[in-house]
Amino acid sequence: MNKNTLQKDTNGAATELGYIFTFLLGVMLLSMFSMWAWDIETATRERWNEQAIQANLDDIAAAVERADEASRMGDVQYSESVYWRATEADENQFILSLTNEQLILEDSAGSLDLEVSISGAGSGQHSGSVQLSGISTIWIVHSEGVTSIQLERPQ
């Protein structure tokens, strides 16, 4: 004789709940890992961006120093092009200014304002201000006793 009786079996439900909790734990761990990896990538990109901008300013300051050295030779004209390394910053907001003591980068957004000191040991004045929107080359020019920065190649 074959008797069919229903039995209350909770083992299957416990297994299903275990699958669900394991899945949710995996989703949570992957989400945390994704946020951690994104944070590392963002911090690295920002650091590289700041280092590229600082290297650009250092290159321009070195070119200004070379123009000052040429100005001490007498009535000479000197020009040098400096390549502006590409950055991820919004360079439409950047204004680069040259004074007698400093090379100043002004960022309208305010997060990347930088200054590089220069010796000012040339025989003339320093002047110039350029907007860095879409440029790849900056010219350092010493002519008629003035060292300046400009975007156009001198004639």
Where are these regions (language model features)?
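C-terminal juxtamembrane segment of a hydrophobic transmembrane alpha-helix
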Residues: T15, Y19-T44
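Broad hydrophobic/π-residue packing in well-ordered secondary structure
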Residues: T5-Q7, G18, D68, N92
